[in-house]
Amino acid sequence: MYTAGYAHRDSSFSSTASKIARVSTENTTAGLISEVVYREDQPMMTQLLLLPLLQQLGQQSRWQLWLTPQQKLSREWVQASGLPLTKVMQISQLSPCHTVESMVRALRTGNYSVVIGWLADDLTEEEHAELVDAANEGNAMGFIMRPVSASSHATRQLSGLKIHSNLYH
């Protein structure tokens, strides 16, 4: 009985995320940069949040770029997640010091609907502004993925999503 409530929440959450994804892809007048802070031991919540949006963006003619520090995306996972295998590009083993610069370059080109990069440290104001400008110029979305371990969870900020949007400022 208790889990049924969670199952109901997950489906409504997924439905809400799908609606946000539709609105986001229909409103293509500006770029977006968001930071997603998540617990490494609970990756499913991040997938529930991002997959509907990534699936919707996969319908565009542009690529999706994943800048991963160590992990390599498996073809099976990409296909099982409903992402277009022919539009997903990955650069792995990327040094964290090059991630922001690579994201800026990729976002600016306009060749990618979304650029996803992993960073352990917070962005500086200058880095964030540079990413926002690049996303706007390329009419793309950028996600900064910031994993936190369960042990450091008590000392760091709670898992959450930072949405930087001019709609709220």
UniProtKB/Swiss-Prot annotation:
Keywords carried by this UniProt record: Cell cycle, Cell division, DNA damage, Septation, SOS response
Name of the molecule in the record: Cell division inhibitor SulA
Residue ranges of the region described as FtsZ binding: 106-112
Signal recorded as keyword: no
Gene3D superfamilies for this protein: P-loop containing nucleotide triphosphate hydrolases
Listed InterPro entries: Cell_div_suppressor_SulA, P-loop_NTPase, SulA_CellDiv_inhibitor, SulA_enterobact
A Pfam family assignment: SulA
Highest taxon, organism lineage: Bacteria
Post-translational modification: Is rapidly cleaved and degraded by the Lon protease once DNA damage is repaired.
